[in-house]
């Protein structure tokens, strides 16, 4: 869901806000949560940040959102921190996400929970669909593993977010079919990962990708990110002072 920093936004207030939010969590179906802060003035959505929630299923997500909306403590928390971070729950985007490479396969992410990310807006060619995009993933993943030496130490992993195009979602207006995302442990690591792709993978894989989709290369959304919650490490807390 899209979020905007308010006049009281600060590292200290974010630490407090996320700590209190975590104390309100009751849904076992929540697998993870991440926050994104713009790292480029040329992002397509300007200074909009994002709060990503990963659920076990669409039904679980819908049920949890319904419960959250009627939770008096959740409403109070939202009002308490609206000048720190204001998020548009009604404008959230429903996305089906796939992450073919484990986040720590090419090195552990920082203990602070920080990560660096790039998102491309992608569109299916006429006659193509999500099925074509999913079928391409094993080919790309194989290319990644074939270049282990290049990616080592970067924490590189990637994901595809397939849009459900919910009526009020911000990505619906843009007509985005799916997002192609890359994640690393730093900006320098992203530069390294992109160099590996350009040198060793693009000539083989890009023509295959172009058979079913195109991505805007004139606008790449770049973010500093933090893990807010990890169901496999429930005691983890991010450190927003580190990047």
Listing of model-derived features with the role each one plays in the protein:
Residues 1-243:
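Short S/T/G/P-rich N-terminal loop/turn motif that feeds into the first structured element of a domain
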């Amino acid at each position: 869901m899209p979020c905007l920093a308010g006049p009281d936004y600060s590292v200290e207030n974010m630490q407090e806000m996320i700590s209190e939010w975590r104390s309100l969590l009751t849904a076992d179906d929540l697998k993870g949560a991440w926050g994104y802060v713009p790292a480029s003035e040329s992002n397509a959505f300007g200074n909009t940040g994002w709060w990503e929630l990963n659920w076990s299923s669409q039904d679980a997500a819908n049920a949890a959102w319904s419960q959250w909306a009627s939770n008096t403590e959740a409403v109070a928390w939202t009002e308490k921190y609206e000048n720190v971070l204001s998020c548009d729950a009604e404008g959230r985007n429903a996305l089906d996400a796939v992450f073919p490479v484990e986040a720590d396969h090419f090195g552990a992410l920082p203990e602070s929970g920080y990560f660096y990310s790039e998102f491309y807006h992608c569109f299916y060619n006429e006659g193509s669909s999500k099925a074509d995009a999913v079928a391409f993933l094993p080919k790309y993943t194989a290319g990644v593993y074939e270049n282990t030496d290049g990616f080592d130490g970067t924490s590189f992993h990637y994901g595809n977010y397939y849009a459900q195009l919910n009526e009020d979602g911000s990505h619906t207006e843009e007509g985005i079919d799916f997002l192609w995302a890359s994640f690393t442990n730093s900006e320098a690591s992203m530069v390294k990962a992109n160099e590996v792709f350009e040198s060793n993978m693009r000539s083989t894989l890009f023509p295959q990708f172009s058979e079913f989709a195109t991505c805007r290369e004139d606008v790449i959304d770049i973010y500093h990110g933090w893990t807010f919650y990890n169901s496999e490490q429930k005691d983890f807390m991010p450190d927003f002072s580190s990047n």
